[in-house]
Amino acid sequence: MELQLQDKTLGQWLEHWAETTPDKEYLVYSDRDLRFTWKEFNERVDRMAKGMLSIGIEHGTHVGIWATNVPDWLTFLYAAAKIGAVAVTVNTNYKQNELEFLVENADIHTMCITEGVFDGSYIDMMYTMLPELKESQRGYLKSKRFPRLKNVVYIGQEKYRGMYNTPELLLLGENIEDDKLEAAKKLVDCHDVVNMQYTSGTTGFPKGVMLTHHNIANNGLLTGEHMKFTADDKLCCCVPLFHCFGVVLASMNVLTHGCTQVMVEKFDPLVVLASIHKERCTALYGVPTMFIAELNHPMFPMFDLTSLRTGIMAGSLCPVELMRQVEEKMFMRVTSVYGLTETSPGMTHSRIDDPAEERYNTVGRDFEFTEVRVIDPETGEECPVGVQGEMCNRGYNNMKGYYNNPAATAEVIDKDGFLHSGDLGVKDENGFYRITGRIKDMIIRGGENVYPREIEEYLYHLEGVKDVQVAAVPSKKYGEEVGAFIILHEGVTMTDDVVKDFCRGKIARHKIPKYIFF
């Protein structure tokens, strides 16, 4: 069958598999033996979609999801998608300042949260942000600072003052007639925005990247085709769902191929290895640090990983020797994807049948139905083969734009429709690309984009700081670490710990400078 772009919404994809392969396993949490078939999962999504309708969520409503890869993360995503709402995925490392910025900037109507991560309680941060919440009846939140925010939903069984929990939302949904749900589904178009992810992008403070059903479903479809995915595959996903790596490259790959997603809630190399062994996973995705942790785990030799055949290593610089070790010891042909959140995210991808040296040393070739050009940043002309320039993309995968920010959108998408990445690259005579650097000064730490200016402006508020510059420091583990170069006012002394303590709990931990120079 000829490969072509599909016009299905996420809900239509889900219902397709629920109808054609109802009893096939779709979602598995091996460490707790939790399993959903396509039919079971689709039914739960419909119930959740009714629950969302019951609390005022409708076409175009923005629903925040702030959680690790818990079992209902995908339920909330697809429930929102089915009724035309927009899932705004929130970085699990966010702290108070970042949360408040996102809730306001994204016009969040309903926030869905879990307890939090080890160094931050989402519950506490919500109550700090919304002092009215503890005195509010569920569904009647009236926040002075965030008037658009109407509901907070706890993803789980526990009850918190002013918040719905999952069972309550499902129960409320029972009051919604099937006809109302079906009517909501019919309003959804594949070119509607379904997901917003906040990224520093190529410049500035975090912006909401608007991605459509068409953007992300087709990126997942083509990524899977490059690795010859079929319904028989089982993909182990240990990357966070709030990133494009998890929610698109992994989840949309599974959605468009009808295979099985073996999920890991929070990265733990032992859980990953055990899941592959027990479920006979055929594919594994991860950033380089994850593969290093798996290979170096003392119990690594105890697991049978021979079922693996392929996967993706991406998110930051992928060392050639690490890719060789993964192929040799984990029995999988590693591919790499290059792109941005703004390109849904894949712009280039190596294919499973590409020669090993091409898979190790390049980021592959461009996606079908797109144009990737290496453009001279000075002249705007396309660079010849072998000449470095800016990586630019035009095609189905380009974002719809930055939310409520047409000026920033116009800065990255030119009049010809090419999205400018800010990254430098080179194309060879066989059509393979190599990334050679960045025009801007973005730091990529273990797959996380860190924008120096954001940290610099925060550190300027630290008493005693006269000037500060933030830059990347090379790291074997994370590719890059954050380094802060600080000039103090005359007579002021300061230690590294003072700077780090000033940052803790206020900015995400991956943004806190590891190296500080006075």
Language-model regions, residue ranges each:
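Gly/Ser/Thr-rich phosphate-binding loop
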Residues: L171, L273, K278-G286, L295-E358, ...
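Conserved pre-ATP/AMP-binding loop-to-beta segment of ANL
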Residues: P22-E25, R145-L149, V153-Y160, Y164-Y198, ...
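AMP-dependent adenylate-forming
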Residues: W13-T37, K159-Y160
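Conserved AMP-binding/adenylation subdomain of ANL enzymes
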Residues: A217-K234, F242-A283, F291-A293, H297-P298
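AMP-binding/adenylate-forming catalytic core of the ANL superfamily
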Residues: Y94-E104, I113-E115, L284, G395, ...
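Conserved AMP-binding A3 loop
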Residues: R35-K39, K185-L187, H191-N218
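Conserved AMP-binding/adenylate-forming core of the ANL superfamily
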Residues: Y26-V70, L74-Y78, K95-E100, N165-E174, ...
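Structural core segment of the AMP-binding/adenylate-forming
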Residues: I83-L171, E490
